[in-house]
Amino acid sequence: MKKKNIKNSMNNHTPMIKQYLSLKSQYPDMLLFYQMGDFYELFYEDAERISELLKITLTKKGYSNHKIIPMAGVPCHKSEYYLSKLVKLGESIAICDQQKETDCKKKLISRKVVRIITPGTVTDEVLLEENEDNFIAAIWKENNQFGYSVLDLSLGFFGVSKIFSSCDLLSEIERTNPKEILYPENFSDVFLIESRKCIRKRSLLEFDLETSYKLLNLQFNTCSLDGFGIEKNNFVIRAAGCLLQYVKSMNMTVLPNIRQLKYNYMEDSIFMNFSTRKSLEITQNISGEKKNTLSAILNKTVTSMGSRMLNRWLNSPLKNFKIVRNRHESVEALKFFYKELQFILRQVNDLERIYSRLALRTASPHDFVRMRSTLEILPNLHLILKKIKSKHIKKIRLSIGYFEEVLCLLKKAISLKPSKCIRDGGVIAELYNIELDELRSIKINSKEYIKNFEQKEKKKLMIESFKIKFNKIIGYYIQISKRHTHLIPKYYVIIQTLKNTERYSVPLLKEYEEKVLNSEMRSLLLEKKLYAEIFNIIEPFLEKLQNSALALSELDVLVNLSERAISLNYTRPIMSEKYGISLLESRHPVVECFLKTPFIKNSVFLSRTQRMIIITGPNMGGKSTYMRQIALIVIMAGIGSFVPARYALIGSIDKIFTRIGSADDLSNGYSTFMMEMMEISNILHNATSNSLVLIDELGRGTSTNEGLSLAWSCSRYLININKSMTLLSTHFVELTKLEEKEKFVKNFHFSAIKSDLHIAFLYKIKNGISKKSYGISVASLSGLPDSVLEDAEKKLIEIENT
């Protein structure tokens, strides 16, 4: 955020602005919400910024230091609505509350920052995206390698990775999608992250190795980090230490919900770089939206926990066939139970995030209600799960648990419909505490007492307009019409005169008011105490609650995959340690869902003797769709899903690379051709014999001869050096001659039928070569003038006959 010099001389400012500037200087990079009564007000550049971001009125608040004070504000009771918008925009906010009213009207009210909100450290339900993880990340670079750490405070997840290249770092950032990134002041690769919304430069001291090591051991109550696999991994220790320190300082508290550190072994999952994720549109489409993605088709989970877990799985398909086969076996076993299980799971609330708020002691009364309703349905869930004969489902069932003690406590202690916040009272249930019930009865009976007092006095004084009312400023008062004031006894004390009425007080009424107000205050204090005790009682169950939340999430995902398999006619894939991919009558999982006509099924066979498939055919003929569907089917199989094919055998895949489509990166001075060459270079350097490589129209963007030469040499490198499983589409017919020279290459094509200037695509892959690209016929579909198309046809005949 840009800073303006707004304090030439502190002495010339008003006391309130002096206080504001003093607080603002402690949080220069954040918007300061400064409480003024029932409003949060922002001044100077903060006011201008929030006015622009939220489209609220920019006004002024008088003068200070001989200058107008720009001001914008939001009501305190609506602050969460505005905070949610700001967090989504990547803004951070410091909340400054009034601390104590002063008896002297001229004396400045004391204020202090009571809460800091940043995009990566929020845990409040209203500030979080329901179906997305909310990671904050830290990066440390040394010797061209990176330590990368992520933390989701709302889930209690803390993880680290060691990354060996900037390209892999970009891929990991894309996979985890952190809402906030911390980096050291000497970080030389800022360009990798500068396009993200919220990045923060931190002092090198915050990445100090010794301090980080001590902080991590202190957090986990250990004397060594060996148990987490990072004892001598200085890169990740620095990143994790900085991250932990920052999150603690932002939350102004310890982090009891962070119970373990997970080391992410990159080799456990199928590697996909940034370009691959983007072109395959796994969880985001090319426009950055969620529609028309693999996730949009597969993710019909019924809990927010399950939705987040499935998206994590989609971004990290596994290489561990044992885990994958367990998932496939579970999906198969759940086929006969998914309807009744989904009915129950729809009643499961976000136990994962409730757990974190419980551990942080920020859980709201409504969190307890949601937790209670979730625990109430667990016995019914167990009854169904016990019917399913699956070892993995049994393991999940045992992890879910019952929590009878916690449920009993919540039923007794929390009202059926509590207020939103403990400070409003009405949270603790009746009969839970005798003293609280007695204090509440005073207030409840007060209405009857006041009513009786009013009727008695009205009858005694014979005043028709006699009424007893209450407001927060003067408390209980007697209101009488001015025409009856001559009937008022002398012991009635006048407290306010209005146009047509007068207001009075009497000692008896004041005494009762003090009794009621005192009981209300004592009642609220007791409720807060009892509320805190509930956290203490639940604390020993927190770890099991976290495990239960994870088990419920996985169950939701597996039940969802079972439903998808039946609804979309998917087949259970065979996972083989052998080399290759065999798919019979496969379909594109996303495209088939949006077609009004049946999807044309196609097969593929990749093996040690047929490592490369060269595909020719017209644009829009189905080449790119065909290549993408193979990669998407591999990903689906790798997360435990069934796949859109009649038969699927998936061998061991370590990486997926794609070079399908590219936009010019003009901001870095890269053309389409340069971007293509950089991506191909990355593939040639990193693909292995177990990698799946998809390349669309290699060699575009330069002269035909040069493009063909590059395509030829890159293809031979992939065949003989990388030995990867490769699908390559091309318009260079000459490239198909590789089949004659390299024994591992096979030519296939997509065909079309042409009549006059019109074309019909068949979308069926066949052996052999397509002699024509049908470019002019495809161009006719774009609406080019007939004269242009006719002229092009003539020129084509002329060139071909030359």
Swiss-Prot record:
Gene Ontology cellular component annotations, sorted alphabetically: cytosol
**Which terms are listed as keywords in the entry?**
ATP-binding, DNA damage, DNA repair, DNA-binding, Nucleotide-binding
Q: Where does ATP bind?
A: 617-624
Q: Name one GO molecular function term.
A: damaged DNA binding
Q: GO biological process: any one?
A: mismatch repair
What's this protein's function?
This protein is involved in the repair of mismatches in DNA. It is possible that it carries out the mismatch recognition step. This protein has a weak ATPase activity.
| The family this protein is said to belong to | Belongs to the DNA mismatch repair MutS family.
**PANTHER family from the UniProt entry:** DNA MISMATCH REPAIR PROTEIN MSH1, MITOCHONDRIAL, DNA MISMATCH REPAIR PROTEIN MUTS FAMILY MEMBER
Q: Identify this protein by name.
A: DNA mismatch repair protein MutS
Gene behind the chain: mutS
